[in-house]
Swiss-Prot record:
GO terms for biological process: mRNA processing; regulation of gene expression; rRNA processing; tRNA processing. PANTHER family: RIBONUCLEASE 3, RIBONUCLEASE III. It catalyses: Endonucleolytic cleavage to 5'-phosphomonoester. The gene is rnc. This is Ribonuclease 3. It is found in: Cytoplasm. Residues 5-134 form the RNase III domain. It comes from the Bacteria. Its EC number is 3.1.26.3. It comes from Wolbachia pipientis subsp. Culex pipiens (strain wPip). Keywords: Cytoplasm, Endonuclease, Hydrolase, Magnesium, Metal-binding, mRNA processing, Nuclease, RNA-binding, rRNA processing, rRNA-binding, tRNA processing. Mg(2+) binds at E47, N120, E123.
Length: 230
């Protein structure tokens, strides 16, 4: 684990003092590892913590970067910066998949490239840095990777679900209806298929590792259909 710490520290520019917390942050649930108290060791608990830490640090960062913007605009920026796809892209940028510890089955099924695994492990790593080094250390890591993303967003982004809802309201149509079509895959790596339906258009479906992302993808697909017919 010391070798892993030395290697990953060069990538994330942070060196852990607690090797155990680093190992926990990088351990996929498929390993089914247990500690001396027979408790499962995986990145899931740290993922929960890291999600909250990321949201807080990004919120403060945006508050300082855009002093003239109202709450709604800041919220849209934050939603875009902390969504699953953005987190996964940052994880890919630092090649975090190379460090995730998983069983052979998960690895053979592309687990090291799986976007949900990348998202979860990066959130866990953020949680681990917070526990090991405190708020200042984790702020440096997050700002190093997210500040440039925030600067690239010239205007507050509009998510597809909001855009679709506003389109239906402008055209005096009923609001979009989203429905869970099916859920597949194991509990630690699920895949959700969500459909969306609006009046005068055929139902459209999309798949993603979370219901929220699947809804956004479905909304984006139906917006593309609307653009082609108007």
């Amino acid at each position: 684990m010391r070798v892993l710490n030395d290697t990953i520290s060069k990538v994330i520019n942070y060196k852990f003092t607690d090797y155990a917390i680093l190992e926990e942050a990088l351990t996929h649930p498929s390993v089914n590892k247990r500690n001396s108290e027979d408790q499962v060791v995986s990145y899931e608990r740290l993922e929960f913590l890291g999600d909250s830490v990321l949201n807080m640090v990004v919120s403060v960062m945006l508050f300082k970067m855009f002093p003239e913007e109202k709450e709604g605009a800041l919220a849209k920026r934050k939603t875009d910066l902390v969504c699953g796809s953005t987190i996964a892209n940052v994880a890919k940028e630092i090649e975090l998949g190379n460090f995730i510890i998983m069983n052979n089955s998960e690895r053979c099924n592309g687990g090291k490239c799986n976007l949900k695994n990348l998202e979860n492990s990066l959130e866990a790593l953020i949680g681990a840095i917070y526990i090991d080094g405190g708020l200042e250390s984790v702020e440096k890591f997050i700002i190093r990777h997210w500040e440039k993303l925030a600067k690239d967003i010239l205007d507050p982004p509009q998510d597809p679900k909001t855009s679709l809802q506003e389109w239906t309201q402008r055209n005096k149509l009923p609001l979009p209806k989203y429905e869970l079509v099916k859920q597949t895959g194991p509990a630690h790596n699920p895949e959700f298929t969500i459909s969306v339906c609006i009046e005068s258009y055929d139902k459209v479906s999309a798949c993603a590792p979370s219901k929220k992302i699947a809804e956004q993808k479905a909304a984006e697909l139906i917006l593309e259909k609307i653009k082609k017919t108007t």
